[in-house]
Amino acid sequence: MATSPVLFLLLAVFAAGASAATFNIKNNCGFTIWPAGIPVGGGFALGSGQTSSINVPAGTQAGRIWARTGCSFNGGSGSCQTGDCGGQLSCSLSGRPPATLAEYTIGGGSTQDFYDISVIDGFNLAMDFSCSTGDALQCRDPSCPPPQAYQHPNDVATHACSGNNNYQITFCP
């Protein structure tokens, strides 16, 4: 089966405009946390003082990253005191409240990204969340106000970042 030159050109143009975002996650807590992410990121242990990264493809919508605490896993199964996602190390479900959430939608190429912190599902850890060219958001306690974090579904706390950027999430800043 021959590949059409037009199809190849279209794929090349769309691929050139799309880019992934890297989310650098730092644990400043004095204990291990288990960051989790959906639809990208799964879950993993992150010791005190450690940093890890998650690559999120362009076009990812309604993503969220949170830190689980008080976890115990045997292989891929176990439980967490906060943010547990069905007893799995690698999450495919949202975490059980309470969990402080870093929420995002990644555009493609020059399309804008959007991000926010949400405590609608409760608060379990202080968090800083920033885009390399956007606002630095800080939520240090359950009462962090808009525009720093969503407290209620009708709050205005979403921030925009130009496309082709990376993000920093710090737990226990």
Swiss-Prot record:
UniProt keyword terms in alphabetical order: Pathogenesis-related protein, Plant defense, Signal
Highest taxon of source: Eukaryota
The keyword NAD is assigned to this record: no
SUPFAM superfamilies referenced in this protein's UniProt entry, alphabetically: Osmotin, thaumatin-like protein
GO biological process assignments: defense response
Induction: By pathogen infection.
Signal peptide start-end: 1-20
Family: Belongs to the thaumatin family.
PANTHER family assigned: OS03G0233200 PROTEIN (PTHR31048)
Protein name: Thaumatin-like protein PWIR2
